[in-house]
Amino acid sequence: ANLIESGGKGIVCKNGVFGERMRENVERCGGEAIMVNDKWGCPVDPQKVEMALKEHPDTSIVAFVHAETSTGVESDVQNITKLAHEHGCMVIVDSVTGLVGSELRVDEWEIDAIYSGTQKCLSAPPGLSPISFNERAAQKIKSRTSKVQSWFLDLNLIMGYWAGDNKRSYHHTAPVNCLYGLHEALLMVNEEGLEQSWQ
């Protein structure tokens, strides 16, 4: 909702249910989704992604699922991210199933935007969606030419809620009990060891 504006173009990789949902989200934002399709149960093919990037040099994002919940298959986040960056695109990664369950190095691999859920490998109660945007993605959000279509999902407002560069503002009531659950789950991951949890 934040990294693509009406009239924008994004490459969306589909190898299961949640790749299809990414396509729908791009289109709901008024963008054009260039589809890279792979069979269910197969990872996203980086060669197909590269071909789409070459055929559509005016695209701004590549969106894909790290670990497709509907099949359990994992795609090569590091390689796809590198390809996208080589073509001037940002990546949006759905890691709802992958976070903590398999290797994921958000900063080292320079992932621009990523989201997850607390209810999968984090083993915390449902209700929170951990997200991360790097500085490049945050700057793109701040420099949008149009408002994000959803007030609730507008990260400019949420960054103000976090007191980032703006005066602190009220955006929502945080689900405190879920935050306590997430805190405990993270303590358990730390106790086990992150790399051990990938095994």
Protein language model regions, located:
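Active-site C-terminal subdomain of aminotransferase-like
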Residues: 119-198
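Short beta-strand segments
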Residues: 13, 37, 63-66, 94, ...
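Conserved PLP-anchoring active-site segment centered on the Schiff-base-forming lysine
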Residues: 4-20
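Active-site phosphate-binding strand-loop segment of PLP-dependent enzymes
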Residues: 43-100, 113, 121
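Short beta->alpha junction loops
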Residues: 36-42
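Active-site-proximal loop->helix
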Residues: 21-32
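Conserved active-site segment immediately N-terminal to the catalytic lysine
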Residues: 106-119
